[in-house]
Amino acid sequence: MESLSHLVKSTLPNYLSNLPVPDTLGGWFKLSFKDWLALIPPTVVVAGIGYTGYLAFCPAAQDRCSAKKNSGRCNNLIRKHEAKVVDMIDVEDIAEKAAFCRCWKTKNWPYCDGSHGEHNKQTGDNVGPVVVKK
């Protein structure tokens, strides 16, 4: 307990008082490289605390990290009332070739409308259509 007391009462205040924080805006431009290096650790600590607070209290961050969103589900909107989405397409009905969606983002189900391009940009995925040729 004495080590924690020593850290809070003397070590941390001495460290913070010795940081090269300038009094004026122009003083920031006069800092040396060594001074900038000395400011990196407390900046990282403050940024980490801020980011942790953001994840803990921001609703958008909570939604993004929740298990609901990251459940591994592919289909979020097409024919949700069915237990399994199956489409039968007769090869005889295909003129020359047809592109079928695999990303579940299309508005023209089951045909691909290129929605996977935006999906790939947002997620870093590389999904594309299934192309069937006659």
Curated annotation (Swiss-Prot):
<dbReference type="InterPro" id="IPR018967">
    <property type="entry name" value="FeS-contain_CDGSH-typ"/>
</dbReference>
<feature type="binding site">
    <location>
        <position position="101"/>
    </location>
    <ligand>
        <name>[2Fe-2S] cluster</name>
    </ligand>
</feature>
<dbReference type="Pfam" id="PF10660">
    <property type="entry name" value="MitoNEET_N"/>
</dbReference>
<keyword id="KW-1133">Transmembrane helix</keyword>
<dbReference type="GO" id="GO:0046872">
    <property type="term" value="F:metal ion binding"/>
</dbReference>
<feature type="binding site">
    <location>
        <position position="112"/>
    </location>
    <ligand>
        <name>[2Fe-2S] cluster</name>
    </ligand>
</feature>
<dbReference type="InterPro" id="IPR045131">
    <property type="entry name" value="CISD1/2"/>
</dbReference>
<dbReference type="Pfam" id="PF09360">
    <property type="entry name" value="zf-CDGSH"/>
</dbReference>
<feature type="topological domain" description="Cytoplasmic">
    <location>
        <begin position="59"/>
        <end position="134"/>
    </location>
</feature>
<feature type="binding site">
    <location>
        <position position="103"/>
    </location>
    <ligand>
        <name>[2Fe-2S] cluster</name>
    </ligand>
</feature>
<dbReference type="InterPro" id="IPR042216">
    <property type="entry name" value="MitoNEET_CISD"/>
</dbReference>
<protein>
    <recommendedName>
        <fullName>CDGSH iron-sulfur domain-containing protein 2 homolog</fullName>
    </recommendedName>
</protein>
<feature type="transmembrane region" description="Helical">
    <location>
        <begin position="36"/>
        <end position="58"/>
    </location>
</feature>
<dbReference type="InterPro" id="IPR019610">
    <property type="entry name" value="FeS-contain_mitoNEET_N"/>
</dbReference>
<keyword id="KW-0256">Endoplasmic reticulum</keyword>
<keyword id="KW-0001">2Fe-2S</keyword>
<dbReference type="GO" id="GO:0051537">
    <property type="term" value="F:2 iron, 2 sulfur cluster binding"/>
</dbReference>
<feature type="topological domain" description="Lumenal">
    <location>
        <begin position="1"/>
        <end position="35"/>
    </location>
</feature>
<dbReference type="GO" id="GO:0005789">
    <property type="term" value="C:endoplasmic reticulum membrane"/>
</dbReference>
<comment type="similarity">
    <text>Belongs to the CISD protein family. CISD2 subfamily.</text>
</comment>
<keyword id="KW-0472">Membrane</keyword>
<dbReference type="GO" id="GO:0005741">
    <property type="term" value="C:mitochondrial outer membrane"/>
</dbReference>
<keyword id="KW-0479">Metal-binding</keyword>
<dbReference type="GO" id="GO:0010506">
    <property type="term" value="P:regulation of autophagy"/>
</dbReference>
<keyword id="KW-0812">Transmembrane</keyword>
<feature type="binding site">
    <location>
        <position position="116"/>
    </location>
    <ligand>
        <name>[2Fe-2S] cluster</name>
    </ligand>
</feature>
<keyword id="KW-0408">Iron</keyword>
<keyword id="KW-0411">Iron-sulfur</keyword>
